[in-house]
Amino acid sequence: AGFTTVRVPVSYLDRIDDANNYTVDSAWLDRVEEVVQYCYNEGLYVIINIHGDGYNTVEDGWFLVNGEDQDMICEKYEAVWKQIAERFADYDEHLIFESMNEECDGTYNGDPNREYYANLNKYNQIFVDTVRDTGKKNTHRWLLVPGWNTNVEYTVGDYGFEMPTDEKCSAGESRMMVSVHYYDPWDYCGTEDLKTILWGEYGDNLIEVNGFPKMNKAKWGDESYLDDLFTKMQDKFVKNDIPVIIGEYGCIDKSSAYADFSGQIQGNRAYWDGYVAGKAASMGMIPVYWDNGFNGVYGFGLFDRNTYEQTQPEIISTIIEAVKNKDPKAGLDTVVETKTEKTTEAHAYIGIQTEIYTFRNSCSDGKYGKDTDYFNTLIKWGDDDQIIDTGAKFTDATITEDGTYTVSVDGYDFSSDSSKLNMLFVSTDFAFNNTLKVSDVVVKCDDQEIAIDNPLVMADDQGNMYIELVNIYNTDLAALNYTMPKDSFSVTFTIKGMDSVLAA
């Protein structure tokens, strides 16, 4: 026994030919069908949808509740679903169609706009009618529809959601299901920082037994909050013979927060996942985990898609046991082995970018980072996008213990081509955790010294420690008062807690 359903998110975007009656690229539909067939070959249920077309922030996004030309949107939406439904009309009940993904106007603060919500309801009705009209097994296929942003409260509450009618269903009954997503509390489940890393009863135990700081625990959205929302779903839909699918849920990997307690943090993650899955199952709802394929820091991944190996076996087994036994607290005693990966050498590197993109990127950058020919060269763009070596020299730091270290770049007149920086930072090749403490940061521009009282120290996208000093793209970062130097930049900092990183 294990997972029995795969949700396949499908975006169409520029694969729709607007000039040719909204024809979908046949090669793309072939690929969608190929993936569906993979699932069928394993006896799995499959959910396919129109996924990324409804985001205001996505290039080529067109399926917008707040779009100006709603007639065009409805016409295009109907045409696309007609083609999808016709392609899969002979597939049996293992294939489920989902009308859309997290459809909203891109505003995440405040209640839904009722005019836009009415557009969403209209889309759902077009979806149902269009699929049914394509005939064959689509006349009685199970169909899945969401409310505003697939949000539980905005679907069950008095915000405007209306179930579409299913009068054309040949099964003699409505075959409609409701889709919601659950990622509460978001600061625990999805915010990419290492501050909120504990949740619920499991988190309380870690505070009491292991001495975790109380500030690391989510301050809202505990078990009782979840219970209340799921009860509303059960009362409104399940008890009225309308099935509910939790189409996405999950929380990201924050196990690097404390190097010596990664197992406990992952155990709490397993408990949250198991609680959602177990509570859903106990109320007659189906949970579908969101695995985005990423298994690093802040990833949702549970297995490696290249090796097919489970990367989070404890989380997987907790979810399975929670659903099997309809037990939300199946993961309360979950133990995950602490994985303390220490290194024999740790290094720090200055990173810089001027307003005309004379730069050295982070050491973890895939294109210009530590393992490339560009990393030890301060480079600028010349004519025809040619990379020019400025001749500047870098001094990096090898960190062997707690102490004070300096990284620098010198030998180039920065003021000759720029009046300001876009970015100034220190990148490293060792994992960030909350045991590490950075202080006494001083930026030096030639002879000008600038003390940084509250440096922004965090994990980069690879999970390594990163000190951000200047970033014009981060409006929350305090401005640095400096003059562009004629010869050198340096950053000096003191670091403690390196025994959590360095092997003895």
Can you say where each PLM-predicted feature lies in the sequence?
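Extracellular glycoside hydrolase catalytic/binding regions
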Residues: A79-K82, E86-A89, E93-H94, C104-M283
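Aromatic-rich peripheral "rim/lid" segments of glycoside hydrolase catalytic domains that contact
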Residues: S256-E345
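Short beta-strands within extracellular/lumenal beta-sheet-rich domains
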Residues: G391-D413, G463-L480, V491
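Exposed low-complexity, polar/acidic, P/S/T/G-rich flexible segments that act as propeptides
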Residues: N434-Q448, V501-A504
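Catalytic domains of carbohydrate-active enzymes, especially glycoside hydrolases
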Residues: A1-S11, M233-K236, A277-K279, I286
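N-terminal targeting leaders for non-cytosolic proteins
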Residues: A346-T400
